[in-house]
Amino acid sequence: MDTERGSISSSEISRTAHLQDRTVACLPPSYGQLVTILSIDGGGIRGIIPGTILAYLESQLQELDGEEARLVDYFDVISGTSTGGLIVAMLTAQDQSGGHSRNSNRPLFEAKEIVPFYLKHSPKIFPQPRGIFCGWGETIVRLVGGPKFNGKYLHDLVEGFLGDTKLTQSLTNVVIPCFDIKKLQPVIFSSYQAVNNQAMNAKLSDICISTSAAPTFFPAHRFTNEDSEGIKHEFNLIDGGIAANNPTLCAIAEVTKQIIKKNPVMGDISPLDFTRFLVISIGTGSIRNQEKYNAKMASKWGLMCWVFESGSTPILDCYSEAIHDMVDYQSSVVFQALRSEKNYLRIDDDSLKGDLGSVDISTEKNMEGLVEVGEALLKKRVSRVNLESGHYQPISENVTNEEALKRFAKVLSEERKLRESRSPKLKI
């Protein structure tokens, strides 16, 4: 046990007894030096981009720690919005099939299976319009005929592989934002909250369907969940991207709340000690450099044009980009102000153009293009938000995202080994 940090008392361990009821893959921060966070943006079919990045990160961890290594073994919190929420569930829901003889706490999917999953199922989740439903026909249907997609295939798919798995049954702590359209307020589904509030311990399938229910694209999702006293709580939810398309700050906030509450699993980490935070935030690409709209165009728009214009949804594009950018800007400010910028890695591409910038074009050509975007992004230099201009610019060091992920993988591997060496359960 590290004498500088001190040992973990038996009383602290007993106070975290609720964790022993959960099958978790990652030992808590109290056994290590860091709190580790992975965040995945929303973006529909563009989830292929983070899928490519995550596959690379997991492959680096497997090179260090063996082929059984999974992302869930290294992160205290994995957060995701919309398509990011679906990826979170894939990476953290436990595989109940018993296919892993050496280790029972394995997730349903490896990171390398995310992209094939999207390539296989996206054409049915986002069926492309044909015949009279193309062009103006599609426009009229979208304006007066309900959401673009009925969501049935997505619902059946998610319910099929997640079953009745509850939020607290995830293999690490999960944070997934949604938005309650009845109460007009965000709902953050967090494993930390769900442990003590049964009403928030919803099925992962309901949470994934809800956070993916993008207005105009998929129907809103209603479900109920009982609290510990048997009282039913109603949820009327839509896409979490309305509140936090980039859920990085949501995840940091959930961790910070646990630190403030002195949850013993957090050890002696201080809320403002960002040298002890390690955050990887992965985007789904941005159309900001495409400059699709301008003031001359928008000055002539009425309600309908703001909702639907030339195959796009300007009002949603504006909200999504604004929320996405502000979170990254604020995160960058905090880490740079506290001299911890090397602990924060944001990977995103702000140069998407044409169909690549859509959230629902599921043609083979477009999906292959998104895979190429993800692969090219690995080769690009690490960029950070310039605090004066607000734009991304490469950092001074000539480091690619691929190289940065290798460095983070090494830090994550060392942190995991440190926790295992300090854990009484794992000592021989």
UniProtKB/Swiss-Prot annotation:
Motif (DGA/G): 239-241
UniProt keyword Lipid metabolism present: yes
Short motif GXGXXG, span: 42-47
Keywords: Cytoplasm, Hydrolase, Lipid degradation, Lipid metabolism, Phosphoprotein, Plant defense
CC annotations in GO: cytoplasm
EC number: 3.1.1.-
Subcellular localization, as worded in the UniProt entry: Cytoplasm
Function in brief: Possesses non-specific lipolytic acyl hydrolase (LAH) activity. Catalyzes the hydrolysis of the neutral lipids monogalactosyldiacylglycerol (MGDG), digalactosyldiacylglycerol (DGDG) and phosphatidylglycerol (PG), and less efficiently the polar lipids phosphatidylcholine (PC) and phosphatidylinositol (PI), but not the storage lipid triacylglycerol (TAG). May play a role in root development.
Protein name: Patatin-like protein 3
Organismal lineage: Eukaryota, Viridiplantae, Streptophyta, Embryophyta, Tracheophyta
Annotated gene: PLP3
